[in-house]
Amino acid sequence: MHELIEERWSARGYDPDATISAEEITDILEAGRWAPTWGRIQPVRFIVGLRGDATFEQLAAALNRGNKGWAPSAGALILVCTSDAADDAKLHDYGAVDLGLAVAQMSIQAVSMGINPHPMAGFDASAARTAFDVPADKRPMVILALGRLADDPTLLDPDVTDRDSQPRERLPLSEIAFAGRWGEPFTAAK
């Protein structure tokens, strides 16, 4: 597995004084822009807030309670939206796939730059839609926090430090990758 994928994790212990430049955000957005897209429809859109600007404040206000405790320390918050075509199931479904691919590529790009990405579904999508005049044919799905980790975690909220110190775990491949039929683990040929 590539080391950037191994290094990626959704931290919360951001340095509230660290900034992310417009140039760095542009590189991260470019990674999202160049993500694979079904039928070249390119349905993903971004609303970008840098800490201290009005967009950032509106995005932070839309966060659910659990995310409001740590995400405002991020250097940037990005609302990621995609197509919401109620009359076109393919467009609706593939728009979500395209969004996931874009966020994944943005996350890996961020890690390569020493920036920690944390995608969140815990926000009020209706409030975000209203705050930013998101059109009816788009749906806000994710807010991506981007930040630099604090050098001294003892200065952070103990709940954040505790959560960030938990091991990063995933189910074993034998429980998620199958061959032949559902539940039969995939095994590499020897």
Q: Model-derived features: where do they sit?
A:
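Acidic, surface-exposed loops and disordered segments
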Residues: M1-K190
